[in-house]
């Protein structure tokens, strides 16, 4: 059944002339409790059906023995009892039991063959150990009883099959680790150099970008005292399209082995426009070279600039491009492809490019209100912008770029325990789902563009955080929302816990990170960032980042058990923890429903209050020593394990800050008239309640981040926290 059939969209208007836009329609306020009820119903039916299947198995064995004994009376009685009971077992569950042995045999075969998006993949099912043993990549249970088989199939199942408890894909990628390292500092050129350093020699380029607080709050670099000191600190400074071109120069953003993650929320739609336009102009540049148009294009650029200085890439601490940087993306600095190529050519390149680019933008405004605080627009308007981006993605067939990364990491870093992190994150995800459905989008058009982001600490619940998230999402999307298999698959990124890193005995931090990475890899996370040991005291160095990358590489390539891809399955404690955490999440869903759902709870700051309480609980236990932390409150060294003071704190230089301001000034001097027109069109689109992302894609070519933010403040309102 379609989502629209389940939840008909009602057009609701307020009295007066303006239309009232509801984020969650009033008739859908119980959506979280409906999810809880649906999952509990599924779990109860699973137990009941498994019990019937087990009794049928017992009768089957009894029939075999009666037949051997040639007791016709007993056999007839057992046949009648069996037939009566069999009627209570659903047809789907009969098929599960009947197909069990074939499934087991498929994993015993030398190769496992399956399809992903119509592409057939052939994967070897075993690896050889140094002792020449054949180690299965997927280890199957040796169940005989039909009830055990059914219970396991309906609640666990193999990776790649509903409810995806063990993973959303049948096997991991053979030639690529799930490594995605986080970087961002100073100018775009400095961060570009770091990106090329961490990805040099790797088969896949998976870049994760941290932005400075000026960018995070949608502002432009400026000499203003409250802005100048923050330019390029704790993240990269990005204020316009040219910055984005420099940031990812040398990486072909359309290559299937390249993907980009951007940790940006309030101004996320603007950064996505910069990214998309940078990718489009890269492909325009390739077209220019392939067709020998360099001289013609250069002539057009010279006419446009008419003697003025063009933006340029200024290599960081060098006179040359970083190793591995081919210069791709730098030819059209200061201009866009549509200024130098015919419209039909540009439009074709644009359509092909945005359909190919791979990546993720965080864009989760709900967790910003609840935990991280980089909200810039009013919540309703920010959600409208998110919906506009997703609607644009649907209409332009953008399937490989995730429009939102629904994030629990910041909730955990603010102090939430793993259960609250997961409950708030999933509830936020279902809130986005409900809002998009209320706008008329079909779940199968947008749910595959969702991704999730969790923290991994050392608490026991973290060992099952992915299992529970995948299971809850799949059950709800399939049984309540009617989503297809791709919509049911929850894909997530893990970053090891920054909060668990301590400024005392910092060398011990690598041990903590290793254990957290082991949790994540055993739980089949889709990508992983391992924190550097010195992040507790400074921005990581190249040496510490290399060590952090080595942690997950050693697990993936040297640790023998990691060759198996479902090592958690079959563990009594893992299975019990999964059930316990699942029910704890559903209870939290019910508490949120009592407070009016996620948005209603936010109005009374329920989530923030709970996070603060849990943070205080942890800090008190740490302070008293009841919660032991090695090298911090116990097992101190002879000097008392004092806080480590860094020899140098990495900061953006004054030259980098001035460079960013000059880039901005050059943009304004060249495009001042075009900026006025673009910003006016953007505001008009908002007042007419049209999709803003179409206008943002144009404004992003000539306007700065701060200009766009200020234009949207005028029509959408600035963020104000409820008190």
Describe the predicted segments one by one.
Residues 526, 558, 562, 584-678, ...:
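Intrinsic disorder at enzyme termini
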Residues 370-375, 411-417, 454-461, 495-506, ...:
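Short beta-alpha connecting loops at secondary-structure transitions
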Residues 48-94, 98, 288-306, 442-452, ...:
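N-terminal leader/propeptide and maturation segments of large enzyme subunits in energy/redox metabolism
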Residues 2-149:
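Extended helical scaffolds that flank P-loop GTPase cores
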Residues 101, 105-456, 461-462, 480, ...:
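Catalytic alpha/beta active-site cores
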Residues 287-290, 349, 396-404, 436-449, ...:
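Flexible, glycine/charged-enriched surface loops at secondary-structure junctions
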Residues 399, 440-446, 483-496, 504-536, ...:
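Flexible glycine/proline-rich, aromatic-decorated loop/lid segments
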Residues 197-198, 210, 241-251, 274-282, ...:
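Generic, well-ordered alpha-helical scaffold segments in large soluble proteins
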């Amino acid at each position: 059944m379609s989502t629209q059939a389940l939840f008909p969209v009602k057009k609701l208007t307020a009295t007066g002339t303006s239309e009232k836009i509801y984020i969650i329609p009033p008739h859908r306020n119980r959506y979280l409790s409906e999810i809880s009820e649906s999952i509990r119903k599924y779990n109860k039916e699973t137990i009941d059906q498994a019990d019937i299947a087990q009794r049928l198995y017992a009768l089957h064995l009894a029939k075999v023995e009666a037949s051997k004994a040639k007791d016709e009376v007993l056999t007839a009685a057992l046949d009648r009892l069996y037939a009566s009971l069999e009627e209570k077992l659903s047809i789907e569950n009969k098929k599960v039991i009947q197909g069990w042995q074939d499934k087991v045999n498929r994993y015993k075969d030398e190769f496992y063959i399956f399809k992903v998006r119509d592409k057939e993949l052939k994967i070897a099912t075993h690896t050889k150990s140094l002792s020449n043993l054949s180690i299965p990549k997927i280890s199957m249970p040796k169940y005989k009883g039909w009830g055990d088989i059914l219970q396991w199939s309906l609640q666990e199942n193999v990776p790649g099959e509903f409810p995806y408890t063990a993973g959303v894909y049948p096997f991991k990628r053979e030639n690529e680790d799930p490594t995605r390292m986080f970087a961002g500092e100073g100018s775009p050129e400095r961060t570009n150099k770091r990106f090329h350093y961490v990805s040099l020699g790797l088969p896949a380029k998976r870049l994760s970008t941290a932005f400075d607080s000026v960018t995070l709050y949608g502002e432009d670099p400026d000499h203003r005292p409250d802005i100048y000191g923050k330019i390029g600190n704790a993240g990269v400074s990005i204020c316009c399209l040219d910055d984005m071109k420099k940031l990812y120069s040398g990486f072909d953003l359309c290559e299937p082995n390249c993907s980009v993650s951007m940790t940006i929320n309030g101004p996320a739609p603007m950064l996505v426009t910069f990214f998309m336009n940078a990718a489009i102009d890269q492909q325009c540049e390739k077209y220019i070279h392939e067709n020998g148009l360099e001289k013609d294009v250069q002539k057009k650029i010279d006419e446009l600039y008419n003697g003025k200085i063009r933006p340029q890439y200024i290599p960081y601490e060098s006179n040359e491009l970083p190793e591995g940087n081919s210069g791709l993306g730098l030819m059209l600095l200061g201009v866009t492809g549509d200024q130098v190529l015919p419209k039909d050519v540009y439009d074709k390149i644009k359509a092909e490019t945005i359909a190919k680019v791979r990546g993720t933008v965080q864009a989760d405004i709900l967790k910003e209100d609840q935990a991280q605080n980089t909200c810039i627009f009013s919540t309703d308007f920010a959600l409208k912008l998110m919906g506009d981006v997703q609607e644009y993605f649907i209409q332009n067939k953008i399937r490989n770029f995730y429009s939102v990364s629904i994030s629990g990491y910041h909730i955990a870093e603010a102090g939430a325990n793993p259960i609250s992190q997961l409950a708030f994150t999933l509830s936020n995800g279902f809130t986005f789902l409900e809002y998009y459905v209320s706008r008329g989008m079909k779940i199968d058009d947008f749910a595959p563009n969702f991704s999730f982001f969790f923290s991994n600490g050392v608490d026991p619940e973290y060992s099952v955080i992915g299992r529970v998230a995948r299971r809850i999402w799949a059950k709800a999307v399939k049984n309540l929302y009617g989503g297809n298999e791709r919509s049911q698959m929850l894909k997530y990124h893990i970053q090891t816990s920054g909060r668990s890193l301590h400024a005392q005995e910092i060398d011990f931090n690598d041990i903590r990170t290793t254990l957290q990475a082991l949790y994540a890899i055993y739980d089949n996370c889709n990508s992983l960032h391992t924190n550097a040991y010195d992040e507790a005291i400074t921005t990581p160095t190249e040496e510490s980042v290399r060590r952090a990358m080595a942690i997950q590489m050693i697990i993936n390539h040297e640790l023998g058990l990691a060759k198996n891809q479902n090592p958690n399955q079959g563990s009594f404690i893992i299975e019990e923890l999964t059930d316990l955490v699942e029910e704890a999440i559903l209870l939290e869903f019910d508490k949120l429903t009592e407070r009016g759902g996620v948005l209603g709870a936010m109005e009374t700051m329920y989530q923030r209050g709970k996070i603060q309480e849990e943070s205080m609980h942890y800090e008190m236990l740490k302070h008293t020593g009841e919660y032991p932390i090695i090298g911090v409150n116990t097992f101190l060294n002879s000097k008392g394990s004092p806080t480590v003071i860094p020899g140098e704190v990495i900061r953006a230089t004054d030259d980098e800050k001035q460079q960013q301001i000059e880039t901005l000034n050059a943009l304004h001097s060249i495009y001042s008239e075009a900026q006025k027109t673009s910003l006016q069109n953007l505001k008009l689109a908002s007042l007419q309640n049209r999709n803003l992302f179409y206008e943002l894609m144009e404004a992003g070519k000539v306007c700065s981040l701060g200009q766009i933010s200020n234009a949207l403040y005028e029509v959408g309102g600035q963020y104000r926290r409820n008190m």
